[in-house]
Design a protein with these regions (language model features):
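Hydrophobic transmembrane alpha-helices and their membrane-interface caps
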Residues: 4, 311-379, 387, 419, ...
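Signature of alpha-helical transmembrane segments and their immediate interfacial
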Residues: 1-5, 399, 471-525, 602, ...
Length: 656
């Protein structure tokens, strides 16, 4: 229970992101005024591997990839120092850059949509002020991010002619509003035996206060207030992102877990709370992304494989030994080794994830090998007439060196896997160490528990006495083994008499295997049918949000009508880029539908092909690691200073 459950091990990616918002700026302005100064500043940081950026309307994203040898804390601090120096070059009106370490554990473990017939602004405030704090109180929840809906804001529309008459500029008014909208510390003063802190409250509390703010002095010496030179009104913020669930506009909430928290436990706790929140605040929630379902399904399948593999291993031992007591003694090595390995995993801070469970499942056959070899050696001495205690002692001592050599050979194979360099090494560290620890524990058990039980439970035999099992089934099994022995002896005799031919055949098989290996594809992590698809749409530059929303909505409707589609969750204008749309298509469980996810990809592509305005579209599996995004298998970057030339070259490459 104390071992965390997750999809993959916790890994640290050496990435730092610098995001800067520049309201109202075009991508070209963002590139020139924000992105380049930041890129120039951070490129000189020691340990930087490469820097790449993304400049969009209103926002600049600079990604800094460090070498794995650089401590991530030091990398973040160095980036913060350099960006702080470059901040003086950024234009007036741009917001302060936000520097953040990329953390894969900070990705949502649960995403759900919330819909209501209430006022959009009031509903978002309800979710932000009432629902989010309740969810964040759950143990293991780090934060809840809200996307979509309408946010309140105060709009100030300046009258240019009045500003001109007073000699004011929009920039001066903007700075005046910033200067007035502040809470400042005012020091402290003694009050008897106490000391009272003083704070000057200057933040606006209402729209009327904003209207009444002085901005200048008139020709007659009277105060000119903001309401005299501008229309000041409260209203919803301009919508740049639309969230829809099955065609209905909604708000999405993304639940992010704390580092090291149990993903499945956190997600299930949130799902348990949702019905109460729905009833209390009168909204409808729908689960869109649930990491717990994937984790629990994968863990269940692996545990089934582990138990089935263990049962088959014990059955095979029984068939070969034909000795109930011997099988019982040897089979005890399996659960004791697994339990010991779980304790070791807990001590090393590992979680139960696909890599550690894969290591355990692969080790099942290895865990019992040492005990079987020791038990077989003891059995031979028992059949020679030795008493159980002597047979256990001398039988174990006889094969100790061989068993140790076999075990340490396995350790020598898997320990280097745990210490591979790069991100791959971080992923497979827990895998390699889990297998290595498991076989070492099995060696310890084979040299301690197995001989002890053999000395106490094994039955002494007279020389030449038969096995315990002596029925007709045991007789047939022994006859089968005897026949195999004769076949093996004849085969071995032939091989020894035709050494050249045998060596040539082995060489041919080796060379052929190299050819087959080269023809096989390779992946960092395998794709699987997870009952979800990701759809990305891109419309031409200049496409408005209403146009993108309407066209995406028509396509969403066509996809929802496909049999086997459970839900379509769409975000139009992700990161406020209104010409983009991103969907999550939830399919019914793969065991309940006749077609694979690949068939649905083709159907969705056929639907998307009907929209002639689409610039590009892509249908793919969800990212294996949610935090890494859905990067394509091949990514080409066209670099240059002239955007028109870049667009032409990119279009030419797409045609090729």
């Amino acid at each position: 229970r104390r071992l965390g459950t997750d999809l993959y091990p916790d890994v640290t990616f050496p990435f730092v992101t610098v995001s800067t918002v520049y309201p109202g700026a075009s991508p070209e302005d963002v590139e020139e005024s924000i992105t380049r100064p930041i890129e120039d500043a951070v490129s000189s940081i020691a340990g930087v591997d490469r820097v790449f950026s993304l400049s969009r309307e209103n926002v600049s994203l600079v990604f800094i990839q460090f070498k794995l040898s650089v401590p991530i804390g030091q990398a973040v601090q160095n980036a913060r120092d350099k960006v702080g120096i470059a901040q003086g070059q950024l234009p007036l009106g741009s917001e302060q850059p936000v520097i953040a370490q990329y953390d894969i554990s900070a990705q949502p473990v649960l995403v759900f949509s919330a819909a209501s017939g209430a006022d959009p602004v009031a509903f978002r405030e309800l979710l932000n002020d009432r629902v989010r704090p309740r969810i964040e109180q759950i143990d293991g929840v780090a934060a809840v991010r809200i996307q979509g809906g309408a946010e309140p804001e105060v709009l100030v529309e300046l009258f240019p002619e009045r500003l001109s008459a007073l000699g004011l500029t929009p920039g001066a008014v903007f700075q005046r509003i910033q200067a007035e909208h502040l809470d400042l510390p005012g020091g402290r003063y003694p009050a008897g035996s106490l000391e009272v802190g003083v704070r000057v409250k200057g933040e606006f509390q209402s729209v009327d206060e904003i209207r009444a703010m002085p901005v200048a002095t008139g020709p007659d010496g009277s105060l000119v207030r903001l309401g005299d030179v501008a229309l000041v009104r409260a209203g919803p913020k301009e919508v740049r992102t639309i969230v829809r669930t099955n065609g209905v506009e909604s708000v999405s909430l993304e639940v992010v877990k704390q580092a090291g928290a149990n993903t499945a436990v956190v997600a299930n706790a949130v799902k348990k709370l949702l019905p109460e929140l729905e009833a209390q605040h009168r909204f409808q929630a729908q689960i869109l992304i649930d990491q717990a379902v994937t984790i629990e399904a994968n863990a269940h399948e692996v545990w089934i494989a582990i138990f089935f593999g263990g049962a088959m291993a014990i059955l095979i031992i029984l068939v070969f030994l034909l000795d109930g007591r011997g099988t019982f003694i040897s089979s005890l090595a399996l659960p004791t080794s697994v339990i010991g390995t779980l304790f070791a995993m807990y001590a090393m801070g590992f979680s139960l994830n696909q890599l550690t469970l894969l290591g355990l499942s692969l080790a099942i056959g290895l865990l019992i090998d040492d005990a079987v070899v020791v038990r077989e050696s003891i059995t031979r001495r028992l059949e020679a007439g030795q008493d159980p205690a002597t047979a256990a002692s001398e039988g174990t001592r006889e094969i100790a060196l061989a068993v140790m050599a076999t075990t340490f050979t396995l350790v020598a194979v898997f320990v280097p896997v745990a210490f591979m360099s790069g991100i791959v090494g971080q992923f497979f560290r827990e895998f390699g160490l889990t297998i290595s620890v498991a076989v070492l524990i099995s060696l310890f058990i084979a040299f301690t528990l197995d001989p002890m039980l053999s000395a106490r439970l094994a039955k002494a035999r007279r020389p030449g006495e038969a096995h315990e099992a002596s029925g007709p089934v045991a007789t047939r099994i022994r006859a089968f083994f005897d026949a195999n022995d004769r076949i093996y002896a004849r085969t071995l005799d032939w091989v020894l008499r035709h050494k050249v031919l045998t060596a040539a055949a082995a060489t041919l098989l080796f060379v052929g295997s190299l050819g087959v290996a080269g023809a096989l594809g390779s992946e960092f992590l395998p794709n699987e049918d997870r009952n979800q698809l990701v759809v990305n749409l891109e419309y031409p530059p200049g496409t408005s949000l209403p146009t993108s929303s309407a066209r995406s909505g028509a396509l969403e409707k066509a996809v929802r009508e496909l049999p086997g589609v459970a839900a379509v969750y769409a975000v139009i204008g992700p990161s406020e880029d209104v010409r983009l749309a991103r969907w999550r298509v939830n399919l019914v469980d793969k065991n309940a539908r006749a077609e694979s996810d690949e068939a649905y990809k083709e159907k969705i592509r056929a639907i998307l092909a009907k929209d002639r305005l689409l610039l590009t579209s892509a249908v793919s599996d969800p990212p294996t690691l949610e935090g890494l995004g859905d990067w394509p298998p091949i990514l080409m970057r066209v670099v240059g200073r002239d955007f028109d030339v870049l667009r032409k070259e990119a279009a030419r490459m797409i045609e090729v």
